[in-house]
Amino acid sequence: MPRHHPLLSLLSIVCVIFVAGCERYAVTLNERPIYTPKVIYSGYNIADPALASCVKQALIEGNITQPEQLEILNCSFAGVRDLSGIERFSQLKTMNLSNNQLIDIKALLFLGELRQVNLAENPAINCMDIDTLEELLSNATIAAPVCNKPL
């Protein structure tokens, strides 16, 4: 029966803890990279500061390294006015944009993977834009402000 060395076990545990604790750092050996951590995606341009802040937080929390990885975005009560630039995240499936100051939602028309969109409590959104969004995303569930449509 092989003899188990406690020192070897302890060294193994220390190595695992060290590597796990350094996942955010590049590891090199003789100046050659052994491990380089993935960088959070930042190649987007969103003009609205509230939306940019919300997207940045979602990218950090989800450890998103590519725009296609972002599938859920919750920006309710964020003060978002403009959605320009959100189309960069083409794989978004769920968006909560309720209780903001949105007027124009045309950027959502470029997000063909959307399955759930909450636009409630954004009273200034154009009803025609909501109708267009519902037509283009016929498989999606869209919660939108009540529109007074002519009879």
Which residues fall in each region the model found?
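Conserved "Asn-ladder"/turn position within leucine-rich repeats
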Residues: A78, N100, N122-P123
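Non-cytosolic head/periplasmic domains of membrane-anchored proteins
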Residues: G112-C127
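N-terminal capping/linker segments that flank leucine-rich repeat
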Residues: P2-L7, L11-I13, G21-S76, G85, ...
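Conserved LRR concave beta-strand detector
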Residues: I72, Q91-N96, Q116-N118, N139-T141
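Charged, surface-exposed interaction regions in soluble eukaryotic proteins
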Residues: Q101-A107
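Acidic-histidine catalytic/liganding microenvironments
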Residues: L83, F89, L111, N122
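Fold-core signature of tandem repeat domains
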Residues: V80-L83, L102
